[in-house]
Amino acid sequence: TWIMQGYGTMGLEAQEQLPEKPTHIFLQAGVGSMAGAVTGLFSAIYGEDRPVITIVEPNKADCLYRTAEANDGERHFVTGDMNTIMAGLACGEPCSIGWKILSDYADHFISCPDYVAAKGMRILGNPAKGDDRVISGESGAAAFGCVAEIMTNPELADLKKELGLDENSRVLFFSTEGDTDQENYKAIVWDGKYPSTHEN
């Protein structure tokens, strides 16, 4: 509970600095504490007019996605080797408090491969002219990479439409991790490790 309150403070500080209400919020998740806290905060602030909230997990540790997909009132766990570059999200058991909030207020759950997080790291570290550079690690860049993939991959056009993403969308992200593994950061951002598969 204390951890979630801290994440809620993070969300509130971000909300107070926003010039406009976001249309979408994409949140990376491990057990769901951060995602649950931020989802709960924005749902409390905006009520029925809240942004579209999407939860993003690595496909090797997608316990929230599996729980949402089952939709049977039970939490579903991921066991075994959760071998993902998104080490901070490699969690197999949903947080009960976080899941309660997410089950009520999150709109979508996405399970994504490692190359999506790598793409997010590269774009954030090498932004378009006029944008600020962000040094984000694998877990921190997962949600951003997910949106970048959805917006650029023609095979995901239906998902893009379902999420309501277009050139007018205002999307809020939280990068919760820097380059904690500097060698892997360089391998991904400098050397192109984990390339985007649809571009090959």
PLM feature spans:
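Short, acidic/small-residue loops that bind anionic groups at enzyme active sites
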Residues: 24-25, 45-60
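Active-site-proximal loop->helix
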Residues: 63-77, 183-186
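Glycine-rich ThDP/TPP pyrophosphate-binding loop and its adjacent helix/strand module
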Residues: 5-9, 13-44
